Amino acid sequence: MGVNVLASTVSGAIERLGLTYEEVGDIVDASPRSVARWTAGQVVPQRLNKQRLIELAYVADALAEVLPRDQANVWMFSPNRLLEHRKPADLVRDGEYQRVLALIDAMAEGVFV
């Protein structure tokens, strides 16, 4: 994935979830300055950061289909009983984005969560 494609992917996730650079940095374990440089296409993140950013963008795409931006942001940072009271953002940070996607899929199917 090229610098500009990744920058667009990161920027899209930030926009869809209404995230700040600090929030993205918390999710991918990076400084807000690094996130700003990634979104500007100035640098390419290291492998693990890149992987987490791609996973975050994937989650953002799915969540944008079921919740408006302001609700999606709150949902990402709120403890959830169906995730053992963990925050979806924390699961993405820990590489467990598939659990978050499963919950989003359940929401899309009309399962009350």
From Swiss-Prot:
Keywords, ordered alphabetically: Toxin-antitoxin system
Keyword Acyltransferase: no
Pfam short name (any one): Xre_MbcA_ParS_C
Biotechnology remark: Molecules that disrupt the MbcT-MbcA complex could be candidates for anti-tuberculosis therapy.
Record field: transmembrane: none
Induction and repression of expression: Induced by hypoxia. Expression probably induced in both active and resting C57BL/6 mouse macrophages. Induced in persister cells. Induced by Ethambutol, Isoniazid and streptomycin treatment and by starvation, repressed by rifampicin treatment. Probably part of the mbcT-mbcA operon.
Gene null: resulting phenotype: Essential, it cannot be deleted. Deletion of the mbcT-mbcA operon has no visible phenotype.
Biological role stated in the UniProt entry: Antitoxin component of a type II toxin-antitoxin (TA) system. Neutralizes the activity of cognate toxin MbcT by blocking access to the toxin active site.
Quaternary state and interactors: Heterotetramer with 2 subunits each of MbcT and MbcA; the tetramers further assemble into trimers with 3-fold symmetry.
Family membership noted in the UniProt record: Belongs to the MbcA/ParS/Xre antitoxin family.
Name of the molecule in the record: Mycobacterial cidal antitoxin MbcA
Species name: Mycobacterium tuberculosis (strain ATCC 25618 / H37Rv)
High-level lineage: Bacteria, Bacillati, Actinomycetota, Actinomycetes, Mycobacteriales
